[in-house]
Structure formats: structure tokens, C-alpha cells
């Protein structure tokens, strides 16, 4: 399994001959190296409905005939836009031809915000994502605060690689993310959701230096880890 980081919370996984994108916020993302028009993808996994995570999902899904796996309300909302979706919910798992997906808790919000019409559409509960393929498991925490059931995620799953938000303000900050890493007990931890906007500026290298009992790695956009 090859796992690549593409800025903010964008993660690409190549496994079982398929390409999977998590939270493909590409257009308007100053930290990504990807252009939506160049992306080939078989499946898109979404943690929640905010614009900096849904991003280019509709365009990518239609262009590539990709399935979008998302929490039920968000999947329904996207299906109304002509997207092929597979709805799930927290605690549920499903085996796809590209791998196994399980949604975990995340403490955040989830909505589609239409600035032009000043409307907010509820898109269900936010989620974290456990993805398993080729006997390896990746945990993408989505946007979340620290919560004690992260201990349970670590107890019930053998996590090989975890992506944790460290930006603070909208998610947990570096200090809480250090504790999250301890509880999740992943072999390797990569920081995400930082330095995209001024309000979430952080030093990822200081974060990885504070990690204990795991390997911390800062990935620049386009860099990857092979599991």
C-alpha cells in the first residue's frame, strides 16, 4: 500500500490496484500539489461536509465514475448532485473491492455552507476513517477534537499509519494530538490540517518531536509512505 499526503487533509491511497482519495480539497487549496483535472481516482472517502474536505468531490466523482463513501446525510446530499454514493455511518464498516472502510467518531461539525444564498445545510455527523487493505490499516481522523474513545480505536485496531489534525482553533492542537497519538498507538503518525490558513498555523516538526512510542513523520505535499 502506498499512502501519499497532498496538503491540508488530502490523502491518496493506492491499494489493490485502485486509487482512493480522502477529503479531496484541491481547488483553492494553497498547500496541495494536485490539480483536479489531472486526478484519476476510483473511490473518494469523505469525513464530513465542510468545503475544505468535500472540495472537488463532485467533479472528480463524475469525471472518473468514482464511488463516494460518506456519512449517510452527506452521501444523500451528494447523490442529489448526480454522484454515485455509498452511504455509511459511525461504527459501520463495509468491504469494497478497493479495501475495507469503517467510520469512527469525530467531534466536529458537518455542513454545506452556501455563501451566495447565506444558507447552511446539515450533512450529518462528522467521522474519522479507518481504511484497511493489503493487511495494513490507515486511520484518517478527519477534523476532530481529542476524545477519550481514541483509546478504544487503538485497542480494537492495529493502526499502521495515522493522520491527525494539529491546526488548533477548528480541531485539536498539537498538545492534544500528541495524546491522541499515544491513545491510538499507531506505528507512524503524520500531522495534517495545518498551515493552510493563518488561523491554523503550526510547526509540524515541533509536534513530531513530542511524540512518544511511535514514529512521527512530516510529509510535504506529494510525499508518500509505503506500508
Curated annotation (Swiss-Prot):
GO molecular function terms attached to this record: hydrolase activity
Superkingdom as given in the UniProt entry: Bacteria
Pfam family, one: Lactamase_B_2
Keywords: Hydrolase
Similarity remark: Belongs to the UPF0173 family.
NCBIfam families per record: PRK00685.1
Official protein name in the record: UPF0173 metal-dependent hydrolase BCG9842_B0515
UniProt source species: Bacillus cereus (strain G9842)
